[in-house]
Amino acid sequence: MPLVFIKDIDTDTRLGLWKIADELHADEVCPQMVCEELKRKCARRQKETVAVYALLHAMTGRRDLVIGHNADGKPTLDGYIISVSHTIGYASIIMSKTSNVAVDVEYRNNRVFRIVDKFLTKQETALLNGLLQTKDTTLKTIASLTESHDAQTALLLCWCAKETIYKYFSEEKLMFDEMQICLEEFGQEGTFYCTNLRQDIKKTITYMQNEEFVLTYTL
């Protein structure tokens, strides 16, 4: 079954992850109006949308719910605060009845090495270099460590965390340098911090990662 997990974070908040597969049909999981909208989307977007609605049904037991979007592009859902993320192979939803929430999932890939300077500050890069003990003076930045699984994991955690915080504070449209990562260690799952520097608000980022994906969320 493509459902990877549904996890109750607290009494009002649920997190779900779905592995995108070809066998799903839109009319099995999507409301009629969503099925009509799908006809105007490319094949990849169709698969992502169907996976999201399959997961939504698994999490709520309802097929009538329609995900909308506000002026900032943030997903909306009657009766819930919701955040949605999808990447190659996976779709994730976090939803709460009472609290703001945000989630991001990213498949493992080395693209993240090419954009280090885009989303990490020099201070954050130095922090990660220290964390990974890259003392070799011939290595200018963490971007040089493309063969390192740990380096890839650390970068993906930082990328997903900033995407998560951007979604959480969607009205502010934060820039990457307005978010500061504090990642001192990491494993298969755990927590670290990311601060909205514009408001000086530190948020706890909860993460999980394996050989296929990295996922982060906050509430």
Residues covered by each model-derived region:
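Core catalytic alpha/beta fold that binds nucleotide/phospho-ligands
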Residues: M1-L219
